[in-house]
Amino acid sequence: MEQDCDVLIAGGGPTGLTLAILLARRGLKVIVAEKEAAPYPLPRAAHIDHEGMRILQEAGAAEDVFATSRRVARYDFLNSRGKLLLRFDGVDRIGPGGWPSANMIHQPSVEAALRRSLQRYPDAVLNHGWEVGSFVDDGDGVTTRIGTPEGPKTIRSRFLIGADGARSPVRTAAGIAFDDLQFEEPWLVVDVLVDDETRLPAANLQICDPKRPTTCVLMGEGRHRWEFMILKGETAEQVSDDAFVATLLDPWDVKGAVRIERKAVYTFRARIADRWRAGNVLLAGDAAHQTPPFAGQGMCSGLRDAANLAWKLAAVVKDGAPDALLDSYQPERARNLRATIDMAIMMGRMVCTTNRWGALARDLKIGIARILGKQPNRPSGYPTIMEGLIIAESNAAGSYFPQPVAPDGTRLDDVLGAGCWLLSRDMLSAAPIRPFAPAIERWLDDRQSDAVLVRPDRYVFGTGDPRDLRAAWEEATRLRPAALGDPVAAAREDIRI
């Protein structure tokens, strides 16, 4: 049966748009079906980390996103008296991904940057007002019925990706269940436009007050956000009332400094799909997992999904890699994702304590940890890939490969491009890579390795002898070296394989 596209993506949010761009960059024909008639204009996600920015860099949107975002140096947890419990410091510094660790964003601006980038690829089309309905996977591809403003359409694709949010119709139709991780708390979110920034906190804050746990964070594009926990006995209608919201904001003394743009009640949940793949149907973003917002990793997790999935889909569709390559998607992402959710739950339980004595015990425990020097000063890193497409016994396999930044501001990825890299010590004098050689050499020294093979999603396939790495990669993927990206200059021929 003739295909209309290689990949049909249900959902035109950050995950779906990023995946579409990364696929189009690799030569695939992509259709994005977004059910809403127009882009959602109000804020939602507020944070992207360094790894998320690196993924947006490959998608051609990072500079635009960076220009509209804000940096914040501290993330403070305060008790009911305003005393410091815990501080994550220096989160505005450059992280391993080559961008600041914390970037406070305005989601509509992020999506606008991604839509502009998508327009550069004629084989990638975003359709608003297209709602995915039923679909049939016959093993060779997926036939999907879509409701459009012009009437029903049928789209034939090799793969269907459900990036259609927490209520994902694709997930439901595929019969995929959620594993509930036992965190469910209702909160009121209040987003404001800022007229006088000097009257607002300069740090991100978690107010661990048992009377009313509260979050206060910066956002991009001249905005700020408060989140107030909804207490037992309160209703969504009650807490959304203008007068009630005004009483919540009164202690912050921001009257006249801000204007309310949006208020909404959300239930913060922790859930993960028990399967991320059902034949030629795969899930990504909130359709596959939901993370409480306390670690700021909701959007970031969806971007990681897109980065992991894009190169594998392209390898299968375009380069003849085995379909089983896609079976590595969930094992690789799920462990990292569970660690992300666990951290968010831990932070959430610390913040969401509403029992006075429980809060006192928490404060004492944190205080003792600070005295003993056992208190972290930044969020812990996420685990390496432990199973999947890696040489498991190889040093540093599955770890995240950093992106050095040259003295002139050039980033490694922009020089070497997309695809798989084979970096060895004897290549570090090549002109394109010379500005980054000291950082790469230190990385190899620390791991006592002669070479590293870096996957297209910038995770380490393995370290060791260059010839052995190349052979192992070809055996694992069944890809010919030429299929992993043609060299763009003679000096790069041995780097990009």
Question: Can you describe what each PLM-predicted range is?
Answer:
Residues Q3-C5, E150-F159:
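Core beta-strand elements of the Rossmann-like FAD/NAD(P) dinucleotide-binding domain
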Residues H128-V142:
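A conserved short coil-to-beta-strand element within the FAD-binding core of flavoproteins
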